[in-house]
Amino acid sequence: SDDLPWCMVPEKKLTPEDVKYVLSSHYQGTPYDPYASYGDKSMKGAYRSIGINRNDFVALIQLRPDLPADLQAVEWVAYASNALNAMVPFYANVETTPAYLAGTTGEVSTDSFYWVSRMIAAMADASYGKSVFHVERYELGVLSACRALLNQYDACLLYTSPSPRD
């Protein structure tokens, strides 16, 4: 539409959480929200939202210039619908990844972050109004744990690094 802005300059530096929020948008609080239980039903879905249930993967790179070069880049990854998933971070220079996060199989399993994300999204999408509170708590819990792990490992890696700054 010609009425929608193509781009905007942010008022502050964006965090991975900010980007995730935008990519999860489904016009919350407007008549166009496909999950809304209020308003004119003919308006729901009038505009296609970014955070739809047909998303399957999102990744973004966070560059942290205040850290040494080998720790600067973190890739944040999430599977399933952006409105119903949780991002996890990966250092760019790792050689192995825990099995739960590393891969998946063709068989649905709770032993895989990929399949757990897909199952949560599928169940929550069908009952969004009753599920969104739980999904948001899960997303914030995962994010909080991931931020704590990043802080812990950044400190550990900085302490053991032969040169504190590049």
Regions from the language model: what does each represent?
Residues 159-166:
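Conserved small/polar residues in nucleotide/adenosyl-binding loops
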Residues 39-41, 45-154:
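Substrate-recognition/cap regions that form aromatic- and gly/pro-loop-enriched pockets
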Residues 1-45, 49-53:
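Long, internal scaffold/assembly segments composed of regular secondary structure
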